[in-house]
């Protein structure tokens, strides 16, 4: 076939440029991967092509190696980390478990990989006929940092990412108001402390708002995915789970922690009122006289400058005794002068 393509030995010189042009055209078709071909669908790359392009970019190659290292324990469970695409992935059985979640450091590595130039193509690449690649993408799907509807061809019944759900809520006045009330009344829920009656009522009101209900059913994604998952877990456990009515402070005011800090502050005030610590003078750094009386609720005279002391302190009495000797010294001096004049 090659001899026929080249036109025989006697005509090689004249037909060689034409053969090269045919080969170059074939390579161009293979590399461009037009729509409908076996190498790509639209602008999506085959996963092995996306991986080669990532390896050719220093930032993407480094992020890919960091991803493989961060997700190594999960990849080892699957036993196939050599798959093309966004690295050999997570066990499908574990990913489908409701109690399983991606490690936070692995999610962070995925986010960093997505921030490179060639990284997003690894997520959106086409596996073609590679079944191993398809199983890898299915397994890693719950860990991808999506910011829109989950899945490339998400339909009306698909699950939405929480980032997109938050955008839609911000554009809706009713949902935005409900979200503001949720942030105001559910502070202890975010910290995993309690779900108050007020917070539970706000959540129930939110579920009646169509756009706000999307926030309850969405899948955590994006940069805030670990925080989102923690809040959802706390809400399911403290507001509607077995711990909803058990444990301290599961209902009532949302200021329980504030009450604790107020009580601690009152104890410090009572300790200071006992005169255990003397206030410092503003000028020389010495203990201010009368400070204990002032802390205990008395008047407590303050000094009017450096070196001055109140008459209520011991040092004040010392200064009063020295001033009392001044008239006696004058009398003695006068007597000595009189005696000297008579002599």
UniProtKB/Swiss-Prot annotation:
Superkingdom assignment: Eukaryota
Which residues does the propeptide include? Answer: 316-343
Signal peptide range: 1-38
May I have one GO cellular component term? side of membrane
Enumerate the glycosylated residues. Answer: 114, 321
Q: Please note every region of biased composition (Low complexity).
A: 303-313
Q: Which UniProt keywords apply?
A: Cell cycle, Cell membrane, Glycoprotein, GPI-anchor, Growth arrest, Lipoprotein, Membrane, Signal
Q: Gly residues composition bias: which ranges? A: 288-300
Query: What is the recorded membrane topology of this protein?
Result: Lipid-anchor; GPI-anchor
Region Disordered, annotated ranges? 268-317
Enumerate the Gene Ontology biological process terms.
Answer: apoptotic process; axon guidance; camera-type eye development; cell fate commitment; cell population proliferation; cerebellum morphogenesis; developmental growth; dorsal/ventral neural tube patterning
Q: Name one GO molecular function term.
A: oxysterol binding
Q: Which InterPro entries match?
A: GAS1, GDNF/GAS1
- Predominantly, its location class is membrane
Q: Where in the cell is it found?
A: Cell membrane
Q: Where is the lipid attached (GPI-anchor amidated serine)?
A: 315
The entry's function note states: Specific growth arrest protein involved in growth suppression. Blocks entry to S phase. Prevents cycling of normal and transformed cells. Binds 20(S)-hydroxycholesterol (20(S)-OHC).
- Identify the PANTHER family for this entry: GROWTH ARREST-SPECIFIC PROTEIN 1
Spell out the protein name for this chain: Growth arrest-specific protein 1
Q: Which organism is it from?
A: Mus musculus (Mouse)
Organism ancestry: Eukaryota, Metazoa, Chordata, Craniata, Vertebrata
* Gene that encodes the chain: Gas1
């Amino acid at each position: 076939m090659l001899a026929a393509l080249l036109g025989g030995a006697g005509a090689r010189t004249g037909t060689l440029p034409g053969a090269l042009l045919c080969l170059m055209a074939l390579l161009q078709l293979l590399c461009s991967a037009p729509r409908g071909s076996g190498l790509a669908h639209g602008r999506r790359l085959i996963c092995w092509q996306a991986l080669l392009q990532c390896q050719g970019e220093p930032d993407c190659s480094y992020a890919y190696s960091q991803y493989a290292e961060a997700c190594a324990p999960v990849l080892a469970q699957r036993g196939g980390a050599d798959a093309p695409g966004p690295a050999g992935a997570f066990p499908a059985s574990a990913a489908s478990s409701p109690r399983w979640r991606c490690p936070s450091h692995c999610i962070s590595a995925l986010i960093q990989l997505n921030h490179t130039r060639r990284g997003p193509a690894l997520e959106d690449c086409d596996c073609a006929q590679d079944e191993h690649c398809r199983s890898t993408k299915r397994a890693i799907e719950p860990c991808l940092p999506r910011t829109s509807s989950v899945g490339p061809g998400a339909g009306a019944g698909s699950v939405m990412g929480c980032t997109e759900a938050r955008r839609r809520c911000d554009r809706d006045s009713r949902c935005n108001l409900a979200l503001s009330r949720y942030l105001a009344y559910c502070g202890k829920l975010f910290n995993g402390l309690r779900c108050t009656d007020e917070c539970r009522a706000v959540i129930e009101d939110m579920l009646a708002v169509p756009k706000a209900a999307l926030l309850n059913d969405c899948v955590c994604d994006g940069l805030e995915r670990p925080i989102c998952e923690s809040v959802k877990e706390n809400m399911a456990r403290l507001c509607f789970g077995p711990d909803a009515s058990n444990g301290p402070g599961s209902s009532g005011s949302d200021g329980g922690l504030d009450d604790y800090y107020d009580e601690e502050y009152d104890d410090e005030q009572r300790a200071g009122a006992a005169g255990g610590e003397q206030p410092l003078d503003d000028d020389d750094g010495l203990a201010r006289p009368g400070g204990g009386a002032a802390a205990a609720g008395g008047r407590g005279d303050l000094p009017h400058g450096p070196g001055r002391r109140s008459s209520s302190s011991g040092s004040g009495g010392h200064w009063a005794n020295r001033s009392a000797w001044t008239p006696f010294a004058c009398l003695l001096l006068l007597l000595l002068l009189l005696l000297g004049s008579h002599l």
